[in-house]
């Protein structure tokens, strides 16, 4: 376990030194605090970023999905809310029993409850990346049935609780969950070993956004319904823009 945490720490430094190429659509301009600070919108997107990512939405999958949803005029407006600041996205929290801190899970629950109480007519979609997926796995099961019914869909990228929770979020309909686990991403197999595949999920955000839009389209505008069939999926590995030298470094993690 100690070696794996050291690997994560080293990886954080390398990911800063050799970031993936992100265009303006992916970086976006949302503060990630729209629910707390702004007016109610027809749709609320709640997202938990990956470990070490800055801000409330992070700088990869969160802003990309947020901006895709905001660009869909048919939704009538979207409030994007990141989980934080109690969720610090620290590396060490990955080793906790729930894959993140209790403070992070409780904060996410409070945001879902805030969306439902402040904006009773809003429809909710959610997501998480890496440690952020553990935040969603921890928060959603304990929500009231009324709030769960308001959630149209949840997208999880590089799901660190995929194996532990059986490819689902407990006590939540499987047809409302879309899991992206790239080939070779070992965190999806229940480990803390991070490989290059864990950084490929920006390539899946367009598909994930469209899926959330489809989920919203199937939900009535002011109320929501839940169901129980399964549609959780795995995504193929996509090419990373990092150097071959970095890839070689990753290949030695498990040795």
From Swiss-Prot:
GO terms for molecular function: cutinase activity. This is Cutinase 2. Optimum pH is 9-10. Partially inhibited by the serine protease inhibitor phenylmethanesulfonyl fluoride. Inhibited by various ions, including copper, iron, sodium, potassium, magnesium and calcium. Inhibited by the chelating agent EDTA (ethylenediaminetetraacetic acid). Inhibited by the surfactants sodium dodecyl sulfate and polysorbate 80. Pfam families: Cutinase. Induction: Induced during growth on cutin, in a manner dependent on transcription factors FarA and FARB. Induced during growth on olive oil. Not induced during growth on the lipidic carbon sources 16-hydroxyhexadecanoic acid and propyl ricinoleate (synthetic cutin monomers), or triacetin and triesterate (triglycerides). Repressed during growth on glucose and on starch. Residues 1-17 form the signal peptide. Belongs to the cutinase family. Keywords: Disulfide bond, Hydrolase, Secreted, Serine esterase, Signal. It is found in: Secreted. Residues 220-255 have a biased composition (Low complexity). Disulfide bonds join 40-119, 66-80, 181-188. The active site is at 130 (nucleophile), 185, 198 (proton donor/acceptor). GO terms for cellular component: extracellular region. It is an enzyme of class 3 (hydrolase). May be exploited in the production of biodiesel. InterPro entries: AB_hydrolase_fold, Cutinase/axe, CUTINASE_1, CUTINASE_2, Cutinase_monf. Its main location: secreted.
């Amino acid at each position: 376990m100690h070696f794996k945490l050291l690997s994560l720490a080293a990886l954080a430094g390398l990911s800063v030194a050799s970031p993936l190429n992100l265009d303006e659509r992916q970086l976006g301009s949302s503060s990630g605090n729209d629910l707390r600070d702004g007016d109610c919108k027809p749709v609320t997107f709640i997202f938990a970023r990956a470990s070490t990512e800055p801000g409330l939405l992070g700088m990869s999958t969160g802003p990309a999905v947020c901006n895709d949803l905001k660009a869909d005029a048919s939704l009538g407006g979207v409030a994007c809310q990141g989980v934080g600041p109690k969720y610090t996205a620290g590396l060490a929290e990955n080793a906790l029993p729930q894959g993140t801190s209790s403070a992070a899970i409780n904060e996410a629950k409070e945001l879902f409850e805030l969306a439902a109480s402040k904006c009773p007519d809003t429809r909710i979609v959610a997501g998480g990346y890496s440690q952020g997926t553990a935040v969603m796995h921890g928060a959603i099961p304990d929500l009231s049935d009324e709030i769960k019914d308001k959630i149209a869909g949840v997208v999880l990228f590089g799901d660190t609780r995929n194996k532990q929770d059986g490819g689902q979020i407990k006590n939540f309909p499987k047809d409302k969950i879309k899991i992206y686990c790239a080939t070779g991403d070992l965190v999806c197999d229940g480990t803390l070993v991070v490989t290059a595949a864990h950084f490929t999920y920006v390539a899946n955000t367009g598909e994930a956004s469209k899926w959330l839009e489809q989920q919203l389209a199937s939900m009535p505008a002011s109320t929501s319904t839940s169901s129980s069939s399964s549609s959780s999926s795995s995504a193929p590995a996509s090419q990373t823009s990092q150097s071959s030298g970095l890839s070689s470094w990753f290949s030695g993690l498990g040795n």
